[in-house]
């Protein structure tokens, strides 16, 4: 019997889920797909400055799982930037945090409603 799915906890969805060259036709060969949980590891580790261990606790998974997700996310990000491909963020094995869970002292739900993932108040540049 297979092991049950362990969902990765994600604080908030990206404000934009598509990035890339403005003049490119986004066919399948010109597109890189990144999952929402891969995006979350990039956000937590590279933007927020968390260690892989801290990221793992926030996402409710093992550090080795975060390491694998992070490696794949960086490969996809590099492929998009270096080869001029559109980066599409969608899907993945995640559940959106309600801000009430164990270890969620950041108030994800309230923060998401007020600021979004960028950490900026709405209308702030």
From Swiss-Prot:
InterPro entries: RNA_pol_sigma_r3/r4-like, UPF0251, WH-like_DNA-bd_sf
Protein name, per record: UPF0251 protein DSY3441
Family note: Belongs to the UPF0251 family.
HAMAP family: UPF0251
Organism: Desulfitobacterium hafniense (strain Y51)
């Amino acid at each position: 019997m297979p092991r049950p799915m362990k969902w990765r906890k994600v604080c908030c969805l990206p404000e934009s889920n598509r990035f890339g060259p403005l003049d490119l036709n986004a066919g399948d060969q010109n597109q890189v797909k990144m999952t929402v949980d891969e995006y979350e590891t990039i956000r937590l580790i590279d933007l927020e400055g968390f260690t892989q261990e801290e990221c793992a606790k926030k996402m409710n998974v093992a550090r080795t799982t975060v390491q694998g997700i992070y490696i794949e996310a960086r490969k996809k990000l590099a492929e998009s930037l270096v080869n001029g491909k559109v980066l599409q963020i969608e899907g993945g094995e995640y559940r959106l945090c309600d801000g009430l869970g164990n270890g969620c002292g950041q108030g994800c739900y309230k923060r998401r409603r007020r600021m979004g993932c960028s950490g900026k108040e709405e209308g702030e540049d």
